[in-house]
């Protein structure tokens, strides 16, 4: 794998979350340094977080992000290589290329570490 940042595109298969909103994987980015060391980013599109026309507020989205970390991201870590120090789960109402400023997009981010086989929320 080397030291290069790697990305794997997602697909349009809906992923179940507690709120019931439609969520799809945009991409997974790994082998990228983060503030806590090796970081894996799972980036999801969740149109219902949009401020206009959306039905999911931030507090509801937080529960969805925890569920995505526990039931989607964490089980897939073994397929990506070394266990990361941190997992970032992001939701965006529209697909945004990684590293691109998109002030028109609504985006939520949460950071997690893995402890005792579960995702532990971290201050981000």
What kind of region is each of these model predictions?
Residues 2-39, 48-50, 123:
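N-proximal, solvent-exposed amphipathic alpha-helical segments enriched in charged/polar residues
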Residues 41-43, 60, 105-109:
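Generic alpha-helical propensity signal that fires on short helical segments
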Residues 6-14, 54-61, 113-115:
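A generic short-segment signal for beta-strand/edge and adjacent turn/coil regions
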């Amino acid at each position: 794998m080397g030291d290069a940042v790697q990305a794997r595109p997602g697909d349009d298969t809906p992923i179940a979350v507690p709120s019931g909103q439609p969520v799809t994987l945009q991409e997974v980015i790994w082998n990228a340094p983060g503030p806590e060391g090796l970081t894996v980013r799972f980036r999801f599109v969740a149109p219902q977080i949009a401020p206009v026309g959306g039905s999911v507020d931030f507090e509801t989205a937080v529960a969805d992000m925890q569920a995505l970390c526990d039931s989607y991201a964490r089980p897939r870590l073994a397929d990506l290589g070394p266990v990361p120090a941190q997992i970032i789960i992001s939701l965006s109402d529209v697909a945004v290329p990684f590293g691109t400023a998109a002030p028109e997009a609504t985006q939520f981010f949460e950071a997690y570490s893995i402890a005792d086989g579960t995702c532990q929320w971290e201050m981000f």
